[in-house]
């Protein structure tokens, strides 16, 4: 089955959780974009929500599709955030996010949310994080080389993310270092070690944050929770 169809299926299930009057965090990335479109369909049918976008790209899409947007300064709580993930570890449902370049804002909104609902296709499920790709780490541009060397001392192969021949810039004006650690046995410990490095703004490790993961594959939909995941 086409991956886009799977993403749409997961997005529709997640958006079913949105109720009238909710403040909803809007994730970033190809899967989250489907959720924004599905939510916009419900808004056009009369659903009233306020969206909190996690990137300028998501804000543009949501505005174009007619979703009213707000900010964390205006809203004291976020009822539900719907977002994608690059990898989901079975069991505790720890996540790697940030290949779309919005990990800092995604983590801020997720942390402010009552519930974080992750939508993925089954290819994103792994036994251990780091099995498929790099861990993005957002860093200050000043002295990023020193930050990269500190990450290398933790065991990573580090590459500065580039776009159009220049360093990729996040919405906050930061760089992203893509760090290949290999399989990550203890993500919470690694997250803490990375966060202690001067120059690190945020890592793409989301540990203990997902309320549920909605997984779509050719057999249908499965909803994983940290307590019920295999």
Curated annotation (Swiss-Prot):
GO biological process, alphabetically ordered: pentose-phosphate shunt, non-oxidative branch
MF terms (GO), sorted A to Z: ribose-5-phosphate isomerase activity
Residues at the catalytic site: 106
Keywords: Isomerase
Pathway field: Carbohydrate degradation; pentose phosphate pathway; D-ribose 5-phosphate from D-ribulose 5-phosphate (non-oxidative stage): step 1/1
Enzyme class, first EC level, given as a word: isomerase
Subunit composition and interactions: Homodimer.
Its biological purpose: Catalyzes the reversible conversion of ribose-5-phosphate to ribulose 5-phosphate.
HAMAP family noted in UniProt: Rib_5P_isom_A
Identification of the protein by name: Ribose-5-phosphate isomerase A
Native species: Gloeobacter violaceus (strain ATCC 29082 / PCC 7421)
Gene responsible for this protein: rpiA
